[in-house]
């Protein structure tokens, strides 16, 4: 038994799966005398995850700057075993002498050098991901056997200690340890509108541009969504069909190719995403009031389960005000002087005078930053009393113009953007408060139906350049955002078109279109309906929903070590579920890993693999 081969299966080789693979290599390198190991990598795709597919066109960009992307973990994220070292995405493209052409997105041999703060084509991240896989595979192959399976894991059988994984190509893999790192399958969003027809309905957003090739120039298409996936579709139908952006007097203008359809975009909320700001001045600092100690103090005071609106939001809003005034002070008086203000903030907090100090700073500001407006009031479009679609569309245009102005100023010169970045920079503290049942059931339901979407809208938006393109398309009459939130959708089977009717305007807007494109990833799918191994595990009782009564939370139930809980309430300690399948049991699982900082996903992988090797070495 001492020399029995230990088999580890990783189902899904995106960011999470390859993070686990790197950790297995690192631990095997450190513990050379362990039992023989086999690692099985199971994934039907060879071109990377669909959002980062290596065949994507260059105009589909990352919404994070290349200098903030790395698959190689920092030591702080992997305390159990030293990290594998290697280049960040920025260093990787520089090593290959890739250059950025004049249009701002095409990569080639000509043009300017790529900078740390550039938003690069997503296909490059896909290529970097595949390169990382090959680097780890080459080194790890000297330590253990690696088997790659270009297939889908569809079923599972379990005996006392091991698992038999059935693949779509009829292979069966016997495994001692199993990692499920696949994403959730997108549910057609029209089901949330009570309509399930697939007539001229493009229900799967990717791959692009292939999914939109059947849409003709003389047709009209409605895009369900105003976020990143919707932006991808809009760019595919315009820039991807030969349209050009020409800047005149500092304003972007769209020159059509004649191949564009007419585009109408809408969403459930009727609200756009905030665009990502230019980065510059060092805004990072230790939070004054919103930190883990504050969360622990709340739990000691009110109980282990918190109410997000009552307990956590006030801390976040105070921290946003601190960030706003800190950035404003740095802009007006120089960043070297902000440390004194930050010291004043900390002393005021310790002496119970922070609110007084913030109010005093507000009184000297001609523009009073309303954190609640940016978080709440702006987000109920149904209550704004728009007379008609024109007034709503004009509001959208002004909103985008103002946001673009702030994003171009960036965190060095926009106190508003600096304040909003709190929601992104301190996301781990939100996780600390929310994860693993940290909220009451009622609060968790509201968090995952409203707050998580608001946090994403503020912190995970498009590049400012894409917002400028949207404004240019609206001005050119190619794109309209005119229906308001959650319009009524009907299919006219006689006339063969889709009919949209606004619900919140005093004068109703009615529009007909030829096509509907699902421009958002709808992850509200019951795990039992998943066609992969996840659905099979649910049917066999190997896992269950985290909160089965929820109308918005479809996460897999896991313990604090990411082991799935079976139908009898017992953790499967040789299985780990990591990533988007946990969204609801934990918060914000779909993100790109960064260098030189703590990354929770890499920490989780380290803990899981550490536990495997502690068993193997016994």
Language model feature labels by segment:
Residues 1-56, 107-617:
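Flavin (primarily FAD) cofactor-binding/catalytic cores of flavoenzymes
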Residues 14, 59, 69, 82, ...:
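Compositionally biased, intrinsically disordered low-complexity regions
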Residues 44-45, 55-64, 70, 77:
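Conserved small-residue
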Residues 67-70, 87-92, 207, 291-294:
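Short, solvent-exposed coil/turn linker segments
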Residues 71-130, 456:
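Conserved N-terminal/central alpha/beta ligand/cofactor-binding core
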